[in-house]
A protein has these predicted regions:
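Cleavable N-terminal export/targeting peptides
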Residues: 1-26
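Short glycine/proline- and aromatic-enriched beta-strand/turn motifs that initiate or cap beta-hairpins
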Residues: 19-68, 168-174
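Flexible, solvent-exposed loop segments that connect beta-strands
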Residues: 22-24, 28-30, 57-59, 68-91, ...
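Predominantly the C-terminal beta-signal and adjacent terminal strand-loop region
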Residues: 25, 73-75, 129-175
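Hydrophobic, lipid-facing positions within transmembrane beta-strands of outer-membrane proteins
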Residues: 29-31, 42-46, 64, 89-93, ...
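Residues on the lipid-exposed face of transmembrane beta-strands in outer-membrane beta-barrel proteins
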Residues: 35, 46-50, 93-97, 111-115, ...
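Transmembrane beta-strands of outer-membrane beta-barrel pores
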Residues: 35-41, 50, 70-76, 85-89, ...
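Outer-membrane beta-barrel channels and translocator barrels
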Residues: 53-59, 100-104, 151-153
């Protein structure tokens, strides 16, 4: 009985994987717009990606996507008679490997190299004597995510890892 269940599960997984092959392939283009999940403020995340290589690294079904990312996030920390205002603008390039596991679910992971145009500003007593902190610069990090397709061109995604937020979710348009 266990062998039969295992065989049925394997057939189901492989049949779903074969149906999932068109989720992301060479030439596929994605535009994603999302928001970050943070305690303060609402980060905005925008990205574009294009499938450039199928069977990446010799792995059947693995597709390399390259693209760009833009993120914006600002918030203020108010405390009595003073406040800090933080702003981050991230502009970068992404490389993601997509692998279809089940029908309608595009799973992926990869890296981003970006520049963080950041600022921190103090407003309050003794503002002239408070040193401005050093912020911003080049950043490198990893991303893992999944995109579920509602239709051939529209889906929802969730990403975790480096970006304007540790977790971002939103809509994805495929064309």
């Amino acid at each position: 009985m266990k062998k039969l269940a295992l065989i049925i599960a394997a057939v189901a997984i492989f049949s779903m994987s074969s149906n999932a092959q068109d989720l992301f392939k060479k030439g596929t283009q994605l535009f994603k717009l999302g928001i970050g999940v943070n305690g303060d403020g609402t980060p905005i995340d925008v990205s574009y990606e294009k499938g450039v290589k199928e069977d990446f690294l010799g792995v059947d079904g693995l597709v390399l996507g390259l693209g760009g990312n833009f993120g914006y996030y600002d918030f203020s920390n108010l405390a009595g008679s003073y406040s800090w205002k933080y702003t981050n603008i991230i502009v970068g390039a992404r490389a993601l490997a997509h692998y279809p596991i089940i029908d309608k679910l595009d799973t992926y992971g990869g890296v981003i190299l970006a520049y963080n145009v950041a600022s921190a500003k103090y407003d309050g007593p003794n503002a002239g004597s408070i040193p401005t902190p050093s912020v911003g610069g080049f950043v490198f990090g990893g991303i893992a995510g999944a995109r579920y397709e509602f239709s051939e061109s529209l889906g929802a995604y969730i990403e975790a890892g480096f970006g304007i937020s540790n977790v971002s979710l939103g809509l994805a348009y495929k064309f």
